[in-house]
Amino acid sequence: MTQEKKDFTIHALPVLKDNIIWIWEASGQAVVVDPAVSEPVKEFLSQNNLALNSVLQTHHHDDHIGGTRDLISNWPSASIIACKTDLERIPFQTHSVTDQEVFTLFGYSVKVLEVPGHTRGHVAYYLSDTNADNRNPALFCGDTLFAGGCGRLFEGTPHEMFKSLKLLNSLPSNTKIYCAHEYTESNLHWANHLYPEDLLIKKRLEYVSSQRANGLLSLPSTIAEERKTNLFFRARTLEQFSQFRKHKDNWMS
């Protein structure tokens, strides 16, 4: 039986130094993406009279799962969705998912995309069937793709991350990118350092710097924007990607 699609809103909840917890709200319920901590989430849900429906976990790092156990204690019936290969590192998951698996939330299809590189068991969640509602597709991508950057390679290889980014780069250009950290300004400073004559990077850096100076987020981004100004997205070869990643790892702004 097909679930009726529900009107929804995606909220940004900044926590810690630069984490963003995304809260997908519909009809008095919420899906929380990568809850680094629990108290701000509980406060937001309480203030907005929302019940926790599900938690989407992109990977096992503590600044993404640190608040989940406490949320479970408050909403024990909530679904905890995470990658099956990370079951040992995210043992409280109730729904273990695999690459290309599709499940439904709020009447919308959500596709699981395995995107290793930052960690071995990293996944992204792609909400695609929104066109009939005049909405952009949405991608919750954790620490794989950032606005202007990508995640460090803590467990994966350059080849794995390059392949993961190529997969995300193949998504529709109007896809909104809901990544898990506000790193955009730093990423663009690095890109501008390498390519000071690139007007697209320079213009975006000016805009993002203005946003941040006024206390505003630079997120979400879009696939189209990343194709223009994200050097990791623009890398044509594995060698070029690897050079960018090595340079970024050792760069000090």
Swiss-Prot record:
What are the required cofactors? Answer: Zn(2+)
Q: Which reaction does it catalyse?
A: an S-(2-hydroxyacyl)glutathione + H2O = a 2-hydroxy carboxylate + glutathione + H(+)
Any one Gene Ontology molecular-function term assigned to this protein's record: metal ion binding
Task: Give the record's keywords alphabetically.
Answer: Hydrolase, Metal-binding, Zinc
Task: Please state the Enzyme Commission number of this protein.
Answer: 3.1.2.6
Which residues bind Zn(2+) 2 per the record? 63-64, 143, 181
Chain residues that bind Zn(2+) 1: 59, 61, 118, 143
Q: Could you provide one GO biological process annotation from this protein's UniProt record?
A: methylglyoxal catabolic process to D-lactate via S-lactoyl-glutathione
Report the domain of life of the source organism. Bacteria
What does the similarity note say?
Belongs to the metallo-beta-lactamase superfamily. Glyoxalase II family.
Query: What name is this protein filed under?
Result: Hydroxyacylglutathione hydrolase
Organism listed in the record: Prochlorococcus marinus (strain MIT 9211)
